[in-house]
Amino acid sequence: PADSEHSAIFQCIQGLPEGALRRIILTASGGAFRDLPVEKLKEVKVADALKHPNWNMGKKITVDSATLFNKGLEVIEAHYLFGAEYDDIEIVIHPQSIIHSMVETQ
């Protein structure tokens, strides 16, 4: 897998017996708006979305990160790549961006 999140999952599940994967946890930095009160979201501009707190990326992926759109795509990817049910895929906000994803096993 090309995404760091999915690559981490792939590495975690190597050697697991069939059926041992209980849950996939994808992490998200939270993007540029993670500390913004919900009522302020109506006022944000594209320039605000481009101020990612952790990463220097291209414009599209930075906006996708700020809106968490990229996490929606990553959930779909994890579902198809690893055969996980959508209810077994979680997103956790992890502002430090140290862990890219985790798995829970039985």
UniProtKB/Swiss-Prot annotation:
The keyword Cell cycle does not apply. Belongs to the DXR family. Its EC number is 1.1.1.267. GO terms for cellular component: chloroplast stroma. This is 1-deoxy-D-xylulose 5-phosphate reductoisomerase. One of its GO terms (biological process) is isopentenyl diphosphate biosynthetic process, methylerythritol 4-phosphate pathway involved in terpenoid biosynthetic process. It is found in: Plastid, Chloroplast stroma. It comes from the Eukaryota. Pathway: Isoprenoid biosynthesis; isopentenyl diphosphate biosynthesis via DXP pathway; isopentenyl diphosphate from 1-deoxy-D-xylulose 5-phosphate: step 1/6. It comes from Origanum vulgare. It is an enzyme of class 1 (oxidoreductase). Mn(2+) binds at D3, E5, E74. The lineage of its organism: Eukaryota, Viridiplantae, Streptophyta, Embryophyta, Tracheophyta. Its cofactor is Mn(2+); Mg(2+). InterPro entries: DXP_reductoisomerase (IPR003821), DXP_reductoisomerase_C (IPR013644). It catalyses: 2-C-methyl-D-erythritol 4-phosphate + NADP(+) = 1-deoxy-D-xylulose 5-phosphate + NADPH + H(+).
